[in-house]
Each structure stands twice: as structure tokens, then as C-alpha cells.
A protein has these predicted regions:
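Extreme N-terminal tail/first-helix region
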Residues: 1-28
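A generic local structural motif
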Residues: 23-24, 50-51, 136-138
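Covalent nucleotidyltransferase core used to form phosphodiester bonds in nucleic acids
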Residues: 26-28, 62-75
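Short, well-ordered strand-loop elements centered on a beta-strand within folded domains, enriched
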Residues: 64, 159-160
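A short helix-loop-beta-strand connector motif used in the catalytic cores of GNAT acetyltransferases and
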Residues: 31-35, 146-147
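Short beta-strand segments
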Residues: 33-68
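Short, structured beta-strand-loop surface elements
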Residues: 68-150, 155-158
């Protein structure tokens, strides 16, 4: 049996237009659902880079998902292993640990699926569909092959 490759993840065309607006609103402390700003040092430039991300918070634990695959922020976070999460007016340095493919699939199936399913009016599934990420719910193992997940914990790895 030949393993089927995961489809490449691409951001929908609206994302380059939406992200600057989202960043402005989030920087002003406006909450936009489960969104936050992630600031992480560029792996080549060394400069801080900031992008809006979906932040999943459940039972005292936090995760962010590379919905569009191996993007620049994902590669930067892998290299730095730490960043700054800003939610409203609260900024926090966090350590980021990328989940293995198996753990990411388990996260999608047992944590994210009920989380998304609990959103009113089917909003979670609608948003995932608009982002081209419905496979996170429909086929977690396949999604985990090309949608990285990072668990965030307080503090910096250098300070431990």
C-alpha cells in the first residue's frame, strides 16, 4: 500500500487582507474570539515577527495550530522554541513544544473536535471550513501530517 501524501496547506486568499486588520484590532486589546498575537524571533533575521494565531485554551493548557502548514511563523517558532503571546492587553513569554504527528492527531481528535463542536451555531466547523482546515475534525491523522501543533507553557526555556 502506498501512503498518500498530505495535501499542501495554503492560506485562503482573504488571509493576507485579514491579518493586518486582525493585528491592529488585537494590538488595541480587542478580543476576536480565540485569537492572539504571537511574536517570535525570526530564525534568519533575528528580528521579532508578529502574526495573529488561533489560541486554544482548555483546562489550563494552551495550544496554537499551524493551520496553513509550514509557514514562516511555524519555522521561526521551531527554531526559537519560545515566543510572546498577547491576548488583549496581557503579554506573556511562553515556551513552545511541537507535538509529534501522533500527539497532534490525538489532540485534534480528543481535544479540538469537542472544543470546536461546543461552539454555538456550528461556528467552529464553519470557520475551519472557510480556512480550508475541516480535515482537522474529519481526518485528524491526515491533518496532523501537515498542520503542526505547539503546546505553550509559561516562561522561557532559557530561564529554566
Amino acid at each position: 500500500m502506498i501512503a498518500q501524501a498530505a495535501p499542501p496547506s495554503r492560506a485562503p486568499r482573504l488571509i493576507p487582507f485579514f491579518n493586518p486588520l486582525a493585528m491592529r484590532l488585537l494590538r488595541r486589546g480587542r478580543l476576536m474570539g480565540p485569537n492572539a498575537l504571537l511574536s517570535v524571533r525570526g530564525r534568519k533575521s533575528g528580528e521579532m515577527r508578529t502574526t495573529p494565531v488561533a489560541l486554544v485554551e482548555l483546562d489550563g493548557r494552551r495550544w496554537i495550530i499551524g493551520t496553513f502548514g509550514d509557514t514562516n511563523w511555524v519555522r521561526n517558532l521551531r527554531a526559537a522554541a519560545e515566543g510572546i503571546i498577547t491576548v488583549g492587553n496581557r503579554r506573556e513569554t511562553v515556551q513552545a513544544l511541537e507535538l509529534s504527528r501522533e500527539d497532534a492527531a490525538g489532540f485534534f481528535a480528543t481535544t479540538l473536535k469537542p472544543y470546536v463542536g461546543g461552539m454555538p451555531l456550528g461556528l467552529g466547523r464553519l470557520i475551519l471550513g472557510m480556512l480550508g482546515a475541516r480535515d482537522i475534525i474529519d481526518d485528524p491523522a491526515r491533518a496532523a501530517a501537515h498542520r503542526p501543533v505547539f503546546e505553550l507553557t509559561p516562561g522561557s526555556p532559557r530561564s529554566r
